[in-house]
């Protein structure tokens, strides 16, 4: 007679296995197991073809309860332990048989993992436990700070999928992402991060220690690490090694080894050392690569951000050499990507606009268009004031807000005479609200209060429902206000949790001065705004009705963020990238009877629907322009997908359109092609390899 195991497999029923389990329970309880009792329990079981092993265990538990409760408890505990072990064994088997690391992951697949191996398995194996532990720690903190009721509400929000906590699967106590100041690195090297290296003294030691710095910092954060000063510091060491006039000696032979390298080749080798090292899997991150971001600046932006900066020796950055190095690195990196598939660094070009439809630094605006026309892929961040900076793929912050966050704080402690908090920022935690679910629940309440029935799985137009816009929007605002308020409390509790780790000396990056915790945000994530609009029958596109709907939601969150801001907690709002969240929320909502769009299988993370081919690039720039993004703090990057690369003049014109619309964060995407046979990489979308 066959029994069915928990993993679906079948095997022959074994009386001996059942007896062994009962004997083990008696042994655990410290009592003697009589053969007559053993036979009585096993003979009394009702076994039939295909019975589940869990049902057999239930019958044994009942029998033991009537005989010896102490042994019954031991039997239950033993089986619970074995159940977890069996579950992990099944997972290992499934993971080994998966096609890649992403499909093998059950809880939080990561795009930065390219290979499936024993290291990635080890990372995946305990994600479920980490999620449970993270929830236990945070609910305990919420209960102590607020109430048991709010702690239970947090779990209910997660369970009902109206709330999503990003990166719950990591080790408890990890902050999210960071843009560091590298100044402590210039003074102390890696000593304060537990290393033995002293401060770098030349270009060679700078590159080697910088790689270790980024890996060390990234090991204490779940997400990205941005180093906006990277090229400025590299230029400093090149000038120290080869003189202030090194641009006049780029073709001079400076390497006296048999290679006889010129200065420009030495610089290229330094680029290669750093970039290729950053694209290697990191053992301390479960074989992920580090998510590394850098920034470029035009001249007025650079002067606005780093105008008062001084190196430890009292010297100041030199724009002429830095400008050449920035441009040379972009050119080199673009060419290097024709030889290797290199994801990092994620680059952002920061340009200052003239407040209208053009740029203050015409040279850098032209160069930016030139790089796009040559097939390079990078972000562009626009501002009419150098008081804001996009330092990371998600975060856009106001430097004035950061400075004013703690007026009594001595900025020189962590900012080292820079006069701004431009690079020392980040997000400590991201919690995202499920907008489509929230809006549909609010609409249901609106119609219920008017005794109008709402069918599951249908949007408002499909049901022929009509509504008073002002009254319905009030329901939506009230629900979003309540949700935002709860998220702020949850995030404040998380903030206290990582402060506990900081006080215990567990977060070296903060203690070493690379980042001030009070300069990091607690982020309210937003996803699925187009799906929420479509549920109400609002056409997604550049029109007044959609703009009003968007601003109603985002302004409500923004007001709450400013209202709840404290000395230790600053809140911001971001459009979170699709990643896992957009697909998970879509599937969960569909399963629970909510309306989801039949045109896609995940929620949109933009202000438009990616599959909508009727929208032009100009319209998408309008939708990601100031009229729509003014209440957002980050994550609103426009990814303009193109079939083929444009000319320099065409890209330059699009940049002017972006400036005129206030589209402050954007990039252009063209599919690259990699030949599966010879490995040839093309910046163009090809059907046939030219080699």
Task: Annotate each predicted stretch with a short phrase.
Residues 68, 491, 530-533, 561:
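A structural signal for well-ordered alpha-helices, especially hydrophobic packing surfaces
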Residues 14, 18, 226, 522-529:
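Catalytic-loop motifs flanking and including active-site residues across diverse enzymes
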Residues 1-99, 516:
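Charged, amphipathic alpha-helical regulatory modules used
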Residues 232, 522-535, 555:
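Contiguous, well-ordered alpha-helical segments that form the cores/surfaces of helical PPI scaffolds
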Residues 92-518, 539, 543-691:
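Conserved catalytic cores of very large enzyme subunits
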């Amino acid at each position: 007679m066959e029994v069915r195991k928990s993993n679906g497999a079948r095997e022959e029923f074994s009386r001996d296995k059942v007896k062994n389990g009962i004997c083990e329970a008696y042994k655990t309880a410290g009592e003697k197991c009589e053969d007559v009792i053993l036979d009585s329990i096993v003979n009394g079981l009702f076994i039939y073809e295909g019975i589940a092993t869990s049902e057999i265990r239930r019958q044994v538990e009942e029998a033991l309860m009537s005989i010896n409760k102490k042994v019954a408890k031991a039997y239950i505990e033993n089986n619970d332990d074995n159940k977890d072990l069996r579950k992990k064994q099944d997972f290992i088997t499934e993971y080994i048989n998966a096609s890649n690391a992403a499909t093998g992951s059950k809880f939080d697949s990561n795009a930065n993992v390219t290979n499936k191996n024993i290291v990635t398995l080890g990372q995946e194996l305990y994600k479920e436990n980490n999620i449970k532990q993270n929830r236990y720690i945070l609910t305990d903190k919420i209960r102590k700070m607020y109430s048991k009721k709010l702690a239970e509400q947090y779990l209910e929000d997660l369970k009902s999928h109206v709330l999503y906590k990003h990166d719950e699967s990591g080790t408890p106590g990890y902050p999210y992402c960071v843009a560091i100041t590298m100044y402590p690195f210039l003074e102390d090297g890696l000593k304060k991060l537990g290393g033995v290296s002293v401060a770098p003294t030349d270009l060679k030691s700078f590159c080697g220690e910088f790689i270790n710095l980024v890996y060390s910092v990234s090991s204490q954060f779940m997400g990205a690490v941005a180093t906006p000063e990277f090229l400025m510091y590299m230029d400093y060491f090149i000038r120290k090694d080869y003189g202030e006039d090194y641009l006049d000696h780029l073709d001079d032979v400076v390497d006296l080894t048999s290679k006889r390298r010129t200065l420009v080749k030495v610089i290229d080798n330094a680029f290669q050392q750093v970039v290729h090292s950053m694209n290697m899997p990191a053992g301390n991150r479960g074989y992920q690569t580090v998510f590394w971001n850098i920034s470029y600046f035009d001249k007025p932006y650079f002067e606005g951000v780093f105008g008062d900066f001084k190196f430890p020796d009292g010297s100041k950055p030199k724009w002429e050499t830095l400008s050449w190095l920035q441009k040379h690195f972009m050119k080199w990196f673009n060419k290097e990507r024709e030889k290797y598939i290199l994801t990092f660094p994620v680059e952002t070009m920061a340009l200052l606009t003239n407040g209208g439809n053009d740029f203050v630094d015409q040279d850098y605006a032209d160069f930016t268009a030139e790089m796009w026309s040559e097939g390079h892929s990078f972000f562009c961040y626009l501002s009419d004031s150098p008081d804001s900076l996009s330092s990371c793929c998600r975060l856009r912050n106001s430097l004035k807000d950061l400075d004013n966050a703690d007026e009594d704080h001595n900025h020189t402690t962590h900012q080292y005479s820079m006069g701004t908090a431009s690079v020392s920022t980040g997000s400590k935690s991201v919690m995202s609200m499920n907008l489509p679910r929230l809006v549909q629940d609010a609409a249901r309440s609106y119609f219920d209060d008017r005794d109008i029935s709402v069918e599951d799985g249908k949007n408002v137009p499909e049901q022929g429902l009509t509504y008073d816009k002002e009254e319905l929007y009030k329901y939506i605002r009230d629900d979003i206000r309540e949700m935002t308020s709860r998220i702020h409390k949850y995030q404040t509790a998380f903030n206290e949790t990582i402060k506990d780790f900081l006080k215990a000396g567990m977060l070296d990056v903060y203690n070493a001065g690379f980042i001030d915790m009070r300069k990091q945000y607690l982020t309210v994530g937003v996803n699925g705004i187009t799906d929420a609009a479509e549920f109400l029958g609002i056409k997604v596109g550049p029109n007044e009705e959609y703009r009003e709907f968007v601003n109603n939601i985002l302004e409500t969150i923004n007001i709450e963020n400013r209202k709840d801001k404290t000395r230790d907690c600053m809140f911001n709002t971001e459009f979170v990238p699709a990643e896992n969240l957009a697909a998970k929320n879509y599937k969960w909502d569909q399963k629970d009877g909510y309306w989801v769009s039949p045109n896609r299988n995940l929620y949109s993370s933009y202000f438009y629907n990616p599959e909508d081919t009727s929208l032009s690039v100009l319209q998408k720039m309008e939708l990601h322009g100031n009229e729509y993004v003014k209440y957002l703090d980050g994550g609103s990057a426009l990814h303009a997908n193109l079939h083929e690369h444009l000319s320099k003049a065409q890209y330059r014109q699009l940049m002017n359109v972006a400036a005129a619309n206030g589209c402050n964060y954007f990039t252009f995407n063209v599919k690259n092609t990699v030949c599966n046979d010879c490995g040839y990489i093309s910046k163009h979308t090809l059907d046939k390899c030219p080699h």
